[in-house]
């Protein structure tokens, strides 16, 4: 069954669609990340309950992931496996929120515009041309599972200081 927290509580999905907040979906997401090898022996229900206790109507699914990862990071002193889950949540969130194509990401960065529609590329024309000339090779060489080699704090450092943003939203993955 689909347990909804409150029929008035809505969540905004990455696609922009709106649906009721579902405790079951939050648990399912956390459990699926725990099942990745090496499997983590963590109570996903406990984390989901902590996340649910702090949500508000209109929260974004990306924010649910951020909150869950933060809760896990705080619990790393209880069990190091929580640190691994925090990493999996935050990196999965990044991958779901960005393009899975390096060349597409470079195109977005190159075609960036300011609020007036003026072209303001975030990568050079030279880089853009090289990537476009070799996009199939470059796209094929990236193994996104390698992103999960970074821990939560390493990812948060990259997010804060290094990953390029478009309109305040991270536009690239760790390997882009």
Which functions belong to the PLM regions below?
Residues 2-176:
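Extended catalytic cores of very large enzyme megasubunits
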